[in-house]
Amino acid sequence: RGLGDVYKRQRDFMIDKGFTYCIPPFMIRSDVVTGVMSFDEMDAMMYKIEGEDLYLIGTSEHSMIGKFKDQIVKEEELPITMTSYSPCFRKEVGAHGIEERGIYRVHQFEKQEMVVLCKPEEAMEWYDKMWSYTVELFRSLDIPVRTLECCSGDLADLKVKSCDVEAWSPRPVSYTHLTLPTN
């Protein structure tokens, strides 16, 4: 019970939505990461393993997407839907201040991820589904949530659309950033 039950419920929720559960590697090569984010973002966020071309993952999305590096996925195989639960490691702890973008910026944390590889013309439809699944999951855990669409100036490199999903928190008695579905 407790947190273990919450983790299991998250995983099972995504599997019930048709996602394939993956156990990602916790270290990733730079050529895989730079396929999904800019070098500047990688340098600011990720811990490099000294003497190796490896980084601790900042999110398991990169590992899941990296599985398809240098491959041609046939159109009839799409969409490919994947989910994982993993530890994440980030250098950006406290980088945004305690009240900005949530109070939970720490060096190591765990999170559930979902990734969809789809046809470009289906990308916005899948973005909407992923946002909907995110909200549905938190509400199924009796966590009050709201969403705020991000303006284009707040989007990271290589991103088209994103929204903050925030949860009600008794401390600091306001909504706090939880996750950021992105296309």
Q: Where are the language model's segments positioned?
A:
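Active-site loop/lid in soluble adenylation, ligation, and acyl-transfer enzymes
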Residues: 1, 8-96
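Conserved small/polar residues in nucleotide/adenosyl-binding loops
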Residues: 2-10, 176-182
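Active-site-proximal binding-pocket segments
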Residues: 112, 117-150
